[in-house]
């Protein structure tokens, strides 16, 4: 029994024997806790304990939320940028930009795109199974081809961007996304094929 309830629930005999002392205890308790009917004291005490428990729980939960927020803030921004290509900025060099857009158009419409999706499909089929590779292999063929083309375009725009992309720029960008690629083998395969297609743009 909580110590603050012992003075309230004392036997009547002890109450009569120590009337003065009991009266002082009662006054002290009355000033500390709200007066309530005897039958409701246990219920109110229970809810008080429950409220305290909830406060403790919420008090301990706050650092966890803060920690997750801090971790998300420390997470390398390049990972989110790879997933949202538009946040990377466009290719500024008019020549490279024209070559890039022409290449992307061929990926979607020409025989180059057909060869690309076949190569990607075979490489993904031959790799060690992952949730992503399983999802791709189970797709309907036309949906899968479009999905692979879109992912290739994303990597092309990720690799070829800025004022003028050179080989050292690609090396730097590859190092940025390397930890991400180590966790996403399918993305690594698509990035490699995208780089093969775009290498001539950088070498111009």
Swiss-Prot record:
Recorded family membership: Belongs to the respirovirus protein C family.
Cysteines engaged in disulfide bonds, as pairs: none
Keyword Manganese found: no
Protein name per the record: Protein C
GO biological process: symbiont-mediated suppression of host innate immune response; symbiont-mediated suppression of host JAK-STAT cascade via inhibition of STAT1 activity; symbiont-mediated suppression of host JAK-STAT cascade via inhibition of STAT2 activity; symbiont-mediated suppression of host type I interferon-mediated signaling pathway
Region feature (Disordered): 1-77
Family matches, as Pfam families: Paramyxo_C (PF01692)
Alphabetical list of InterPro entries matching this protein: Paramyxo_C
UniProt source species: Human parainfluenza 1 virus (strain C35)
